[in-house]
Amino acid sequence: MVKTLVFLYLASESRLAFLEKEVQFHSLPREGEWLKLRNRDKGDYFAFRVQEVTHREGSLPEMMLDVLRSSETEYELFDEQELDEYIASYIAEEWLLKSCKENTRYKNHAHQRAD
């Protein structure tokens, strides 16, 4: 098993949440591959694309996951309540909420999720 430090972003139109967790894999996922993360409350319906993998000497590999996408150019955004629910559900899976700040990055390339 390969222990990896995984970074996950979840976004709404106004906020961007950054979560972190040590996750074990049978083999280290590579850039461009897709991951489904355990989420017992909300389900593991979403596949997150591995955006980058960084290897540090003397440390765990670090893996940055891409924000959910609806297409190659648009990002999926949660509504505000749904974002709070997903953050809470990942915290219940032992993810650490490192920050939640204003979303200035994905506003212009976003698609609001429709349920």
List the model feature ranges, each with a label.
Residues 44-55:
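Short beta-strand-centered aromatic/proline hotspots
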Residues 18-25:
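Short alpha-helix capping/helix-loop boundary micro-motifs
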Residues 1-17:
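Short, basic/aromatic beta-hairpin or loop at an interaction surface
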Residues 28-30:
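Short, well-ordered loop/turn sites that connect or cap secondary structure elements
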Residues 60-115:
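Glycine- and charge-enriched low-complexity intrinsically disordered segments
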